């Protein structure tokens, strides 16, 4: 089917009546098709390992972000909430001498609130966290992108990144 798709995309790109933005989209799909076909012909080893009891809990953990030195992992954990049934908070785990992840610690206030924070992304040096927060009073939309700077061992008050990144819509999943 990849070859059939390639033929149709190539024919579309040659059409004089096709809109330029649609031609660009078709070219991107051609590139994706090339990657997919090559990836299937040349698989790479993939052996995921459980991160262990220091990170995993009875609820869900997701959106991990690791510092460039591979020594700290920041992630989102789904937790029970008094306001909502569930909400999300950030946790940090440190790599131990035996290469296991230490018991994750809640990042705490002012980053974590009784509202919803998710999809964190560390800066390379681990001194900034970019993340999504929803329903905050200063939000431009339902969810906005924020950042917090680390001062010693304490995370600073989250700052809304503002316009033009945040709009009246839903902004989420920042990647730094």
Regions found by a protein language model. Give the residues of each.
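Short, conserved micro-motifs composed of acidic
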Residues: 2-4, 8-176
């Amino acid at each position: 089917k990849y070859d059939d798709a390639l033929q149709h995309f190539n024919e579309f790109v040659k059409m004089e009546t096709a809109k330029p933005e649609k031609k660009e989209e078709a070219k991107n799909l051609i590139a994706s098709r090339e990657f997919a076909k090559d990836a299937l012909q040349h698989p790479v080893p993939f052996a995921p390992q459980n991160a262990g009891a220091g990170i995993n809990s009875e609820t869900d953990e997701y959106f991990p972000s690791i510092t460039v030195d591979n020594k700290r992992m920041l992630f989102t954990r789904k937790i029970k909430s008094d306001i909502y049934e569930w909400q999300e908070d950030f946790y940090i785990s440190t790599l131990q001498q035996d290469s296991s992840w230490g018991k994750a610690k809640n990042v705490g206030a002012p980053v974590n609130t009784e509202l919803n924070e998710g999809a964190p992304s560390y800066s390379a040096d681990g001194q900034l966290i970019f993340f999504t927060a929803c329903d905050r009073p200063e939000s431009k939309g339902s969810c906005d992108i924020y950042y917090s700077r680390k001062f010693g061992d304490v995370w600073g008050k989250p700052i809304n990144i503002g316009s033009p990144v945040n709009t009246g819509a839903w902004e989420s999943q920042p990647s730094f």
